[in-house]
UniProtKB/Swiss-Prot annotation:
GO terms classed as biological process: photosynthesis
Pfam family, one: PsbL
Matches recorded under InterPro entries: PSII_PsbL, PSII_PsbL_sf
Assembly behavior: PSII is composed of 1 copy each of membrane proteins PsbA, PsbB, PsbC, PsbD, PsbE, PsbF, PsbH, PsbI, PsbJ, PsbK, PsbL, PsbM, PsbT, PsbX, PsbY, PsbZ, Psb30/Ycf12, peripheral proteins PsbO, CyanoQ (PsbQ), PsbU, PsbV and a large number of cofactors. It forms dimeric complexes.
Subcellular location: Cellular thylakoid membrane
Keyword Nuclease: no
GO CC, any one term: photosystem II reaction center
UniProt key word Phosphoprotein: no
UniProt organism field: Synechococcus sp. (strain ATCC 27144 / PCC 6301 / SAUG 1402/1) (Anacystis nidulans)
Entry keyword set: Membrane, Photosynthesis, Photosystem II, Reaction center, Thylakoid, Transmembrane, Transmembrane helix
Identification of the protein by name: Photosystem II reaction center protein L
Amino acid sequence: MPTRSTNPNKQPVELNRTSLFLGLLLVFVLGILSPATSLTS
């Protein structure tokens, strides 16, 4: 029972952390690309 409840508990946390990291990375990349594209165009 305890191990079964910690497994589903761990997965959402990892997914949440991964999505958060990807979201920050996306914003970071877009933040760099936006000025670069506006400068070139």
